[in-house]
Each structure stands twice: as structure tokens, then as C-alpha cells.
Amino acid sequence: MDNPFARFAGTRTIQANLSLLEENYVPDSFPHRENQINEMVTILSSIMRGSRPSNIIVYGKTGTGKTSTTKYVTKMLVEAASNVSVVYVNCEIYDSPYSILVAIANSAGEEKIPELGWPIDRIYRETVERVEKTGKFFIIILDEMDRLIKKNGGDSLYVLLKLMTDVDSVRVSMIGITNDTTVLENIDARIKSRLNQESIVFPPYNASEIRDIISSRLDKVLGPGVVDDTAINLCAAIGAQEHGDARKAIDLMRIAIEIAIRENRNKITENEIYEARERYEMNVLREAISTLPLHSKIVLLSAVVTQEIEPNSVITGEIYENYRRICDDLGFSPLSPRRISDLLTELADYGLLVMDDRNMGKYGRTRSFSVVHQAETIKKYLLEDENLSMFKSSKMPKQTRFDT
């Protein structure tokens, strides 16, 4: 058998440095974010005068440049001032006071602290000692800070504020990044008053601004003339429709270039962008489904198979009956009808189902659901979970409903 990779080994029509379009790449220029950069630099510049800067809360929707701009500015600060250390904390991963203290302590010392096992007061003392010993200013970036607060209220912020205020020789400031403008409304007033924060808002990009951003990246990724202007315009328009999401527009362009390279095409046109969008949306759908809790997956699977049986309207009671059958078939204990109703509402909030409440007069209100995306695609992604892989829809009985 010929080597199946041989056809990719020859000279490619398009040569591209796609790493410059990856999500973790931090560019050296930020079109249309000059004001936000200047605001952040002004606040952090107090370090250059030997003073601890105010805490900063960065607000903005997904894809508005919050994280990359913050990383860029703090990188420039470290280059300008040798007595600064920056600790980046992804709150999707580090979501407790303990884990955040571990991240800070490990950045300030050579010996790693275990991520579990120490009492919180011990890890706090160790963090204070290590930070003091360095003699540096510490900037703690809390990316997706809203996740942290939603999970444990203001506990993590309280620990950080304690670190900032209890020991004079510990010079720690925080930059919180969030897409939730109400994030601080749910924390204790005493914590909020001690936060002493300044806010920087990243507004959504418009299509023209996203076009500038894509063009500035492409200048370093590809040779001239490889991407049609119409393709850039389309990419920018799609990003602008998604609340000014430059990240999505850049991802679409990266996928479009990958498609062109694999297919040995010599240009990126609108066709490649449309192909990229379809692939992108399928990837997003697959990821959204893969991260659902087990019983949410079973409920979604039940909604899909119930809709296959009764395409016109799928009501909560029918979904629950099929959910219970699927649980019995796969050996899981079913949750209560009330809990399943809550999970159905959550799936609608995630955009995986459409919910319709109807007033049926003397029969009361009824709630029905329908699947947003292609049912077969959703089922395929659900059955990728090994817990559900043995499901056979042929076992589901045909239900009889008498509509009123």
C-alpha cells in the first residue's frame, strides 16, 4: 500500500504560517484598541514610580481582544521593569482560592506546591513568603473571572485582596477579564468596596475594524494576492454579526486557508469561507455537546429520538418517558421529572433546543421543545460518548398522542 501521507508531501500551492492565526498567538499590533492599551498602560505605569497600581476589571464580549491586549501590555511592562512578575490564571481551570494561590506561589518559587493536600492557611503563608522573597510587583491576570465568582462567590477575590492588603511588603495587583458586566453584583459589598478597581471596556468590533485586523494578520501569514478581498469582507461581516467577534473571523480565515492547502487550491475565495463556517459551526456544536454532563446528554438524546418519532411537537412528558427508557436501557438511574424539566430549559439556554410555552386553555400550559440543529448530527455527536455508544434508537417505542 502506498503511504497515504505522500500526497501531502509535495510542494504546496499556498505557503502559510498558520501559527500566527492561532488563539494563543499575541500579535505586536492591535488595530482599534489603542485607547484601551493607553488606559491600561496609564494605570499600570504607577509600578514605574514604585507604587502598587489599582486593580483593573476588563469588560467585553468574546473576541473583542481583552485577553490578547492584556497579555501584550503586561509583556511590555515586564520588558520595561525587571521588578515585575505576571501570573496568568485561566479561571476555567484554576477555579478556587487554593488553586489560585498555588499558581501564584509556584510562579514565585522553584519548588512546586501540590495542587491538592495543603490546608488553605498553609498555602496562603507559603504564597506570602515566596512573593515577599522575590521583592517584585505581581500582576495576577484572572481570565474568565466570572467563572470563578459564579463557582465560589467572592471567596477567591477575598483571598487575593487579603494578599494585597494584609502585608505591606507584598505588592500584588489583579487584572480581571470578563464578558459579564454584572459580575461584581453578586459578591459581598465589603469585598467589592476593598477591590478599588478601575474598569476598561472593550466594545464590539464592527465589520470594517475586523477587516483591518484580519488584513494585518494576513500580511504576515500569506503572500500578497492569495486571499480575495471579497473573502476578507465576508469573514469580517460574519464576525461583526457575532457581536463583533474578531476571534471567530480569524478562526474562519485559518480554517479556510487549511481547506485551500489540503485541496491544493491557489486562492482563498468566498467559497472557502463558506466551507470554513460550516466546519466551524459543526466543531462548536460537537464541543458544546461533548462538554455536557451525562444526564444532560441523555435528555438531549431523548429529545432527538422523541422528535424522530413525533416530528411536529415534542412535549416535556414524552421526552421524560423516553429519557427514562434510555436510562433503563443503559443502566443509569433516572433523575426526577422536575430536574429533567430544568435540564431541558438549560439546553434551550445553550441554544441546543428551542422551547415553546403554549396556553392550552382549560388544559393549562404545555411546554414543547424542538432540536435546533440537524438531529442526526446531534445524535452522532452524542453517541461519541462511550456511556451512550450502546444506545439503539430502534428500541424506542412509537408513541400515540391524542392532540386536543
Swiss-Prot record:
Gene, per the UniProt record: cdc6-2
Pfam families to which the protein is assigned, alphabetical: AAA_22, Cdc6_C, Cdc6_lid
GO biological process: DNA replication
UniProt-annotated binding residues for ATP: T64, G65, K66, T67, S68, Y205, R217
Protein name, as recorded: ORC1-type DNA replication protein 2
This protein's domain notes: The N-terminal AAA+ ATPase domain and the C-terminal winged-helix (WH) domain are both required for stimulation of MCM activity.
Subunit note: Interacts with MCM.
Stated consequence of mutating K66E: Does not affect stimulation of helicase activity
Entry function: Involved in regulation of DNA replication. Stimulates the helicase activity of MCM via stimulation of its ATPase activity. Binding to MCM may result in conformational changes in MCM, leading to catalytic ATP hydrolysis by the helicase. Directly stimulates MCM movement along single-stranded and double-stranded DNA. Does not bind DNA.
SMART domains membership: AAA, Cdc6_C
TM annotation in the entry: none
Family listed: Belongs to the CDC6/cdc18 family.
GO molecular-function terms, A-Z: ATP binding; ATP hydrolysis activity
Top-level taxonomy: Archaea, Methanobacteriati, Thermoplasmatota, Thermoplasmata, Thermoplasmatales
Keywords, alphabetical: ATP-binding, DNA replication, Nucleotide-binding
